[in-house]
């Protein structure tokens, strides 16, 4: 369950963000997570609850937005959604693509009570 290690990184980012603020409680944590991380939202929710115990995040809501995989063709520069993880350009069928979305793990925002 790699979601625990992913959530460990999220909590490091939360701690760094809150380090210079006087926050009583975190009310909401919003994450954006790419499909290629293979993170399961339910497992992330459980990991969040475990990490939040005894912290200002205890009782906070976790909202997760899963981001689909997008790519850009290195040959014709077409930008496209990557359906079913088929990494080929739908226009020219070139196999060389750059992933432009889908690998992220982003702390989008925090809603806090000061």
From Swiss-Prot:
Belongs to the HypA/HybF family. GO terms for molecular function: nickel cation binding; zinc ion binding. Ni(2+) binds at residue 2. Pfam families: HypA. Involved in the maturation of [NiFe] hydrogenases. Required for nickel insertion into the metal center of the hydrogenase. One of its GO terms (biological process) is protein modification process. Gene3D superfamilies: 3.30.2320.80. InterPro entries: HypA/HybF (IPR000688). The lineage of its organism: Bacteria, Bacillati, Bacillota, Clostridia, Eubacteriales. This is Hydrogenase maturation factor HypA. NCBIfam families: hypA. Zn(2+) binds at residues 73, 76, 89, 92. Keywords: Metal-binding, Nickel, Zinc. The keyword NADP does not apply.
């Amino acid at each position: 369950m790699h979601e625990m290690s992913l959530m460990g990184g999220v909590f490091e980012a939360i701690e760094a963000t809150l380090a210079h603020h006087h926050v009583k409680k975190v009310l909401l944590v919003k994450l954006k997570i790419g499909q290629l991380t293979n993170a399961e939202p339910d497992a992330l929710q459980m990991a969040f609850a475990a990490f939040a115990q005894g912290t200002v995040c205890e009782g906070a809501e976790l909202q997760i937005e899963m981001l689909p995989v997008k790519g850009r063709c290195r040959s014709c520069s077409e930008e496209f959604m990557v359906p079913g993880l088929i990494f080929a350009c739908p226009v020219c069928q070139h196999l060389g693509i750059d992933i432009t979305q889908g690998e992220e793990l982003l702390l989008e925002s925090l809603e806090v009570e000061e």
